Amino acid sequence: MASKSNCVLLLAAVLVSIFAAVAAIGNEDCTPWMSTLITPLPSCRDYVEQQACRIETPGSPYLAKQQCCGELANIPQQCRCQALRYFMGPKSRPDQSGLMELPGCPREVQMDFVRILVTPGYCNLTTVHNTPYCLAMEESQWS
């Protein structure tokens, strides 16, 4: 039977390993990945238009969701929230966005939907926060 001090040391070693792994994941630089996006998340644009704007786009809503979630799943976990922010684009520069101002469907309505794409009711993908949620999705909170 292991002594109490050996158990404490083993527990400490396991915790240090976990914290080191989490720190390594959180420190991945998303900049090189983000710079390769020409049209950010093109399948998600169709899905957002279908769901937020009730605009019919080619293909079924189910297929649009699957393609959008697939695009998001291909993005490293720690970069997903940043990718969604990039997709939404700054309000001051709509030309740098994956979203378009549409008649009867302003970008704000679309942005509200984009904010929930990773949540359990939609793509259910973990993010940098190790949950299926992105924090600080308001433009004023972007760093």
UniProtKB/Swiss-Prot annotation:
Q: Which Gene3D superfamilies match?
A: Plant lipid-transfer and hydrophobic proteins
PROSITE patterns cross-referenced by the UniProt entry: CEREAL_TRYP_AMYL_INH
Q: Does the keyword Disulfide bond apply?
A: yes
Expression across tissues is: Developing endosperm.
Localization terms from the record = Secreted
Report what the Swiss-Prot or TrEMBL entry states about this protein's PTMs. Five disulfide bonds, which are essential for the inhibitor activity, are probably present.
Q: Which UniProt keywords apply?
A: Alpha-amylase inhibitor, Disulfide bond, Protease inhibitor, Secreted, Serine protease inhibitor, Signal
Q: MF terms per GO, please? A: alpha-amylase inhibitor activity; serine-type endopeptidase inhibitor activity
What InterPro entries does the annotation carry? Allergen/soft/tryp_amyl_inhib (IPR006106), Allergen/tryp_amyl_inhib_CS (IPR006105), Bifun_inhib/LTP/seed_sf (IPR036312), Bifunc_inhib/LTP/seed_store (IPR016140)
Q: What does UniProt give as the signal peptide span?
A: 1-24
Top-rank taxon of the source lineage equals Eukaryota
Question: Looking at the Swiss-Prot or TrEMBL record, what is one Pfam family this protein matches?
Answer: Tryp_alpha_amyl
Q: Name one GO cellular component term.
A: extracellular region
Anything else the record notes? Answer: CM proteins would be involved in the cooking quality of pasta.
Instruction: Summarize the subunit comment.
Output: Subunit of the tetrameric inhibitor.
Family statement: Belongs to the protease inhibitor I6 (cereal trypsin/alpha-amylase inhibitor) family.
Q: Say what the protein does.
A: Alpha-amylase/trypsin inhibitor. It could be involved in insect defense mechanisms.
Q: What is this protein called?
A: Alpha-amylase/trypsin inhibitor CM16
